[in-house]
Each structure stands twice: as C-alpha cells, then as structure tokens.
From Swiss-Prot:
A Pfam family this chain is assigned to: Thioredoxin
Keywords, alphabetical: Disulfide bond, Electron transport, Redox-active center, Transport
Originating species: Chlamydia caviae (strain ATCC VR-813 / DSM 19441 / 03DC25 / GPIC) (Chlamydophila caviae)
Protein function: Participates in various redox reactions through the reversible oxidation of its active center dithiol to a disulfide and catalyzes dithiol-disulfide exchange reactions.
Domain Thioredoxin: 1-102
Record-level GO BP terms: cell redox homeostasis
Coiled-coil region list: none
S-S pairs: C28-C31
Cited Gene3D superfamilies: Glutaredoxin
Protein name, UniProt field: Thioredoxin
Recorded GO MF terms: protein-disulfide reductase activity
Keyword Amino-acid biosynthesis: no
NCBIfam families tied to this protein: thioredoxin (TIGR01068)
C-alpha cells in the first residue's frame, strides 16, 4: 500500500534514498486513476519509496514545491528534487523515470 504522507512527516519521508511523491486530491479523477498504477509500481520496484500527499489536507508541501496541477509526481533523491512529471502516467513511463535516477 502506498503511504499517505502528511505535512508533518514530509521532510523525513523524502530525506533518504529515492522517493516518488504523488501530489493528489480526492476529487481529482486522474489522481484516482493513478492510484493502482502506483500500487503496481510499488510492488515491482524496490529501489524507490512511494508516498502520496493530499494537497487539500496538507497544502504546505505542495506550496513548497510549486505544485499547481495534479496529479504531480516529484522524484526526490536524498531529500532533493531530481525530476517531476505532471498528469496521468503509465507504469512503464514511471519505471523509466526512476531508472534514470537510480
């Protein structure tokens, strides 16, 4: 199960290793369609930790990283942003993104 990340634990969650964060909202259709893609990705790729931030419940991380459209996926490496994609993506695209930074 993909972990839900709060504003309070966001910085510690992204601090170490490769971490993919999905910025989403409950009312966002493409965000809902992305959830099973992320769950499948998590089951297949052990080199990345995956988390989700609900921008309505925890807006601070989204504001900090300038997220203006959802879903936005930001890839962090040891706490620093290394890449981002906006919109619904398939699993193969996300695997390529992760492999570029592994």
């Amino acid at each position: 199960m993909v972990k839900v990340v709060s504003a309070e634990n966001f910085n510690s969650f992204i601090a170490t290793g490769l971490v993919l964060i999905d910025f989403f909202a409950e009312w966002c259709g493409p965000c809902k369609m992305l959830t099973p893609v992320l769950e499948s990705l998590e089951a297949e790729v052990s080199s990345v930790l995956i988390g989700k931030v609900n921008i309505d419940d925890h807006p601070a991380p989204a504001e900090q990283y300038g997220v203006s459209s959802i879903p936005t996926l930001i890839l962090f490496k040891d706490g620093k942003e290394v890449d981002r994609v906006v919109g619904l993506k398939d699993k193969d695209s996300l695997i390529r993104l992760i492999n570029q930074h592994s």
